[in-house]
Amino acid sequence: MKNRSLTLRLISVLCLTALFVWLGSTLVAWWQVRHDVNKVFDAQQVLFAERLANSDLSTILLESSTTLNKNSQSVLKKSYDDDALAFAIFSKTGKLLFSDGRNGKDFIFNYKTGFYNANIYDDDDKWRIFWRMAANGELVIAVGQELDYREDLIEEMILGQMWIWFASLPILIIVLGWLIHKELRPIKRLSQEVQTRKSGDVSLLNTEGLPVEILPLVKNLNQFFDRTSAMLQRERRFTSDAAHELRSPLAALRIQIEVAQLAGDDVALREQALLHLTQGIDRASQLIEQLLTLSRLDNLQALETLQLLDWEAIVQSLISERYFVAEKRKITLVFEKESEPKQKQGQSILVSLMLRNLLDNAIKYCPEDTIVSVKISSSQIIIEDNGGGVEPEDLKKLGQRFYRPAGQNEKGSGLGLSIVMRIAELHGFKVRLENVVKEGRRIGLKAIISL
């Protein structure tokens, strides 16, 4: 469909609407004027007939056996000289006794009383004639008016109104054009703002002064710009983080490769370099995997395909999965169910990943011969250990991306807890980390997930 000017379309529609409304109003006005004019003239005819019936003229005509002469007609005619009306007075036998000397003498006698539309002698035009008995039925008075006279008057009144409207039509179009242009000015300003916007500019559009009808569209655009801005920030952060964090592992891999190349016949040195190389590749792979996982989680605005979470099944599956890793490090895994947890919906895979990261951190950073317990209650999931806890300064920073407390012997990326926090946020859970204190002594660390 061809794009057209909104201003032109509005003016056209409004003018056509005004035209049709005017035509309808004109038809109604014509009908009303016609009705009122006929009513007024009918009343005028009745009144004139009453005056003739009550005048001395009736007595004169009854006492005289002949019609009045022309001089008498002229004198009586002067008392009511109106081109709109004609009259005649007949005897009850139909003899014309008196008339206005013009059209009245051509009336065709009708003994019936009341209003009738009829022709007269030597005239094809219709007349509306009022017939009335007078002088105890001895006389018949007829007062008539040509219907064309009425129609001409009605037409003159209606055309007078039409010319006024047609004369005001150009003024109406000019005023409508000015008003529409004025009201569409904020939309044009918005259009210019979008057209002149530079590539990559995701700042919010100005909503001040915009019509209410277009405000939802602009708000949706601003929401889109917000999401786009957040996505670009996440991509830039991901690129920066990946470049920063991969620099050290890649440099270490290069060193190990050089060591292996320089080992010569020293088999033990070469084997050690290759072992370190393998471990470095594993750490780099884990870092990349966690970076990609965190990036995917950051791009999620809301979860889809939710299902009811079976907390007990998820926890028991994780404990079984990590049992041998814990046993190798001489760590005991314990599962405690204090009460039935709240029924929550979510994605089991993500919830399992969240709990796995917490459980892996406890297993990885706890010393040997410690206990890691997973407790389920109605409103909380708690993963607790007795591995000595962390310093209060470090506790505040846990969960920040790439943050790892100083003095850690175990290798890691510092992204595990960030992934935990993001998954919890997507599910509406709250995660907090606390040191376990007993008798004033720090004995361990616990992660509390509030459902």
Swiss-Prot record:
Membrane topology: Multi-pass membrane protein
UniProt GO BP: phosphorelay signal transduction system
Modified residues (Phosphohistidine): 244
Main location: membrane
EC number: 2.7.13.3
InterPro entries (alphabetical): 2CSK_N, HAMP_dom, HATPase_C_sf, His_kinase_dom, HisK_dim/P_dom, HisK_dim/P_sf, Sig_transdc_His_kin-like_C, TCS_sensor_his_kinase
SMART domains: HATPase_c, HisKA
Reactions catalysed according to its record: ATP + protein L-histidine = ADP + protein N-phospho-L-histidine
Subcellular location: Cell inner membrane
Periplasmic side: 32-162
Membrane-spanning ranges: 10-31, 163-180
Span of domain Histidine kinase: 241-451
Domain HAMP: 181-233
Pfam families, alphabetized: 2CSK_N, HATPase_c, HisKA
Top-level taxonomic group: Bacteria
GO molecular-function terms, A-Z: ATP binding; phosphorelay sensor kinase activity
NCBIfam families, A to Z: PRK10337.1
Summary of the function given for this chain in its UniProt record: Member of a two-component regulatory system QseB/QseC. May activate QseB by phosphorylation.
Official protein name in the record: Sensor protein QseC
Protein source organism: Haemophilus influenzae (strain ATCC 51907 / DSM 11121 / KW20 / Rd)
Lineage: Bacteria, Pseudomonadati, Pseudomonadota, Gammaproteobacteria, Pasteurellales
